[in-house]
Regions:
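Alpha-helical bundle segments that constitute or directly flank the non-heme di-iron/ferroxidase center
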Residues: 41-47, 113-144, 211-239
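Terminal targeting/low-complexity segments that flank the catalytic cores of oxidoreductases
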Residues: 1-129, 274-328
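Amphipathic alpha-helix face/heptad-repeat signature
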Residues: 126-129, 156, 221-225, 251, ...
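His/Met- and acidic-residue-enriched segments that coordinate or traffic transition-metal cofactors
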Residues: 79, 165, 206
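Long, hydrophobic, well-ordered secondary-structure blocks that form the structural core
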Residues: 113-191
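Acidic/His metal-coordination segments adjacent to aromatic residues that form catalytic metal sites
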Residues: 102-122, 182-222
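Alpha-helical scaffold segments in carbohydrate-active enzymes
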Residues: 155-173, 227, 254-269, 293-296
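Inter-helical turn/loop segments and adjacent helix faces that build the functional surface
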Residues: 138-152, 170-179, 207-216, 234-254, ...
């Protein structure tokens, strides 16, 4: 009589066994974590017709951006929660060291009043812009089809919160030296009404309602964030250096270091998606829709930057070259 076979237990992390090597810390804590993808017909393994399930089925599962195995994506930097905190603790110490050193030197008191007026208009309202980018990254984290993508969105969200808090901190400092320029009081009005910001406001507000996960990724990481980085960080930082604001230049350089990491995982995800036939057209169609909004936002903002001839074209060229480097 044949004896029933004894089932052997699966090895720990059996989903990574195909690689035939001990999985890395990154792979162990980052891969295949989305339980909401186990049953595509019923995300979260609850009523398939409840609003949240319908939302994920429409905006994630039915996205025209397809791949047979999104869980195969890997962050090229292999960032995990532990290493992210180690990395950014050092970066925050650097930034707040800048704040302390320049404050001790009386940096703000030495700024030209005319330049401070530009900061009140073109820098301080940026916290509204950064908050919109933060919300967009948080949505991408929630809606992405793989945990390795969601993790990248999570760290990007946290980085953008850093930018926002840096801006808020500097706004408060500048209000101490220039109490007649409305620092800390007039930013919302400028964000909602100043011509310099209306292109970016249109871009990010529309991006926040691009609910398909793939289109959200394109609008945010391929258009909005590069436009902000090239104009509101790089070009403004260069204008600051031209006007004796060394602190602003160093601060934007530190923020652009975060942006470089975002760009690496963005490029890796684009190249991963392009492995699937048809995704090139999907991405191209979305870029045709969103890239003009990004260029218009750059033009509107850079038109008001002082001492910055050619800033708008340089920023647009930077965005276009970035997308070309991804194969788009």
């Amino acid at each position: 009589m044949t004896q029933p076979a004894v089932l052997q237990p699966l090895k720990t992390w059996s989903h990574l066994a195909a690689r035939r090597r001990k999985p890395s810390e990154y792979e162990i804590v980052s891969t295949n974590l989305h339980y909401s993808t186990d049953r595509p017909d019923a995300p979260f393994e609850l009523d398939p017709n409840m609003p949240m399930a319908l939302w994920f089925k429409q905006n994630r599962n039915a996205s025209p951006l397809k791949h047979a195995d999104w869980n195969g994506f890997r962050d090229p930097d292999e960032i995990i929660y532990r290493t992210y905190n180690m990395l950014q603790d050092g970066h925050e110490n650097y930034v707040y060291g800048l704040f302390d050193q320049f404050s001790a030197r009386g940096h703000d008191a030495m700024l030209d009043h005319g330049w401070a007026r530009h900061l009140a208009r073109l820098y301080a309202p940026g916290r509204y812009l950064f908050h919109a980018l933060q919300m967009g990254s948080a949505y991408l984290c929630q809606i992405a089809p793989a945990s390795t993508i969601s993790n990248c969105g999570t760290y990007q969200t946290a980085d953008t919160l850093r930018w926002l808090t840096h801006t808020a901190y500097r706004t408060r400092e500048l209000s101490n030296s220039f109490d007649d320029l409305g620092f800390g009081a007039g930013e919302r009005d400028k964000w909602e009404n100043d011509p310099a910001w209306q292109g970016f406001r249109e871009l990010v507000e529309k991006a926040l309602v691009a609910y398909d996960w793939g289109e959200s990724f394109v609008a945010l990481n391929l258009v909005a964030r590069p436009a902000v980085e090239e104009a509101v960080l790089r070009a403004l930082g260069q204008a600051g250096r031209h006007n004796g604001d060394t602190l602003l230049g160093l601060l934007t350089d530190a923020q652009l270091a975060d942006a470089d990491r975002h760009r690496r995982w963005t490029g890796a995800l684009v190249k991963f998606a392009l492995q699937t036939e048809g995704n090139d057209k999907v991405l191209a169609d979305w870029l045709a829709k969103w890239a003009p909004l990004g260029d218009a936002a750059i033009d509107a903002y850079c038109a008001h930057l002082p001492d910055s001839p050619g800033a708008a074209q340089a920023a647009k060229d930077g965005c276009a070259e970035l997308r070309r480097s991804y194969g788009l």
